[in-house]
């Protein structure tokens, strides 16, 4: 029984292995759009995964970001690959939603880090988010090369200034950002030729931001 419990514990700290396998309830064949989104990363700097609630958008975003942070790409992966440790920035609407959604997907629940998408044995350390109970601002992740990747968690309500200054290899924006935040994300990846990943439900309708990713729906 102790052996089984230990195996279950270790399995819970490798959650990423449960997603997009060849077979099973989360097999890739059931998530064609997700996989197309991943593949497009090999050709396009900017991408947007639009979908309804509970369609797995945030899971897809956290999955790809984790692969880039760790460098542990599965054999089937035909999206973009980094061959070195990276700097990533992930952000959502508010500090609280970033904690409850992005942080939870990447790390797991507060006090149980390692049960999210980033494998527990690869989380080197985390830094707390000032003023946000149980919030995390920085995640240091062991990269397959032996180096360290860093993921910073921000929120749109911090304003454009919070996104300025640092070069980033990956920017992940979960839910539609203000345009000035999006532009700043592009600026942060300009010198690294990095990726800007958007995962969102178009709750505000066909805004200029959403329409920028829907060229077939542009008025003639």
Question: Predicted regions span which residues?
Answer:
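Phosphate/NTP-binding elements of NTP-utilizing enzymes
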Residues: 1-220
């Amino acid at each position: 029984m102790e052996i089984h419990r230990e195996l279950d514990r270790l399995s819970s700290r490798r959650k990423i292995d449960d997603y997009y396998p060849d077979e099973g309830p989360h097999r890739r064949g059931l998530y064609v759009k997700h996989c197309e989104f991943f593949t497009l990363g090999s050709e396009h700097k900017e991408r947007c995964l639009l979908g309804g609630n509970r369609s797995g958008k945030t899971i897809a975003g956290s999955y790809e970001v984790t692969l880039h942070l760790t460098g542990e790409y599965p054999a089937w992966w035909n999206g973009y690959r980094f061959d070195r440790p990276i700097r990533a920035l992930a952000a959502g609407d508010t500090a609280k939603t970033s904690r409850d959604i992005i942080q939870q997907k990447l790390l797991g629940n507060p006090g149980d880090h390692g049960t999210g998408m980033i494998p527990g044995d690869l989380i080197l350390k985390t830094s707390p988010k000032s003023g946000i109970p149980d919030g995390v601002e920085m995640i240091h992740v062991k990269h397959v090369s032996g180096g360290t990747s860093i993921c910073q968690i921000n929120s749109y309500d911090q304003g454009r200034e919070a996104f300025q200054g640092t070069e980033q290899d990956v920017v992940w924006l979960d839910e539609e950002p203000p345009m000035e935040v999006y532009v700043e994300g592009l600026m942060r990846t300009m010198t690294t030729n990095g990726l800007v990943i958007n995962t969102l439900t178009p709750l505000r309708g066909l805004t200029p931001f959403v329409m920028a990713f829907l060229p077939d729906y542009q008025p003639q």
